């Protein structure tokens, strides 16, 4: 597949996830089905390997706006679950969430949606913002203190209705906490079986190298708009 086709294909999938939450139930479902049925999306069932052994579909579905949109519309929970399950039926096995989205609520939606096929998909979610784990209130700055990470992961597991996070990202690098301490904490969670792989979002190259020296980094997530 040519680079232009890859971008166009991914753009169609992203369009389904971005537009669907603000449409009516029937319109958004039809739009998503049309996107995934497009001849240009034949590659959606192709697999990609992240790191050494994490296999995912070539296109993933982000659920960031499934609890609210930038237009402040509150989407239908039933509709959002249907979109996630439709994506799975069409070959998507990678689903991306974050504690900060909601906060908390998109993880709950995703957790409910994938119950019937949890062991057949990869869930990735993110920690790093300073969010009160009891109230969900967003506090100033970042928080990647190891004790906070552990509390956040426990909450993730409950909301996602799972016993492990397939791919855990640090949402933003915390300048107050050495990356070695962050990765050391994640390494402990991996040993406990609560996290299987980890990645970094928006890191600098030096941070990646320091992190990778402690434990292999599986994936890097950077801002790149296809639309």
PLM-predicted stretches and their roles:
Residues 2-122:
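N-terminal binding-site loop/beta-alpha segment at the start of enzyme catalytic domains
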Residues 4, 44, 179-227:
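Beta/alpha (TIM)-barrel catalytic core signal, keyed to glycine-rich beta->alpha loops juxtaposed to Asp/Glu
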Residues 61, 95, 110, 123, ...:
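Conserved, mostly hydrophobic/aromatic
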Residues 64-66, 100, 126-130, 170-173, ...:
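Active-site beta-loop-alpha junctions enriched in small/polar residues
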Residues 74-86, 145-158, 208:
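Short, acidic/polar
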Residues 84, 107, 111, 153-154, ...:
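Generic structural signal for well-ordered alpha-helices
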Residues 98-106, 174-178, 226-227:
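Acidic-and-aromatic substrate-binding clefts and catalytic sites of carbohydrate-active enzymes
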Residues 158-174:
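Active-site groove signature of glycoside hydrolases
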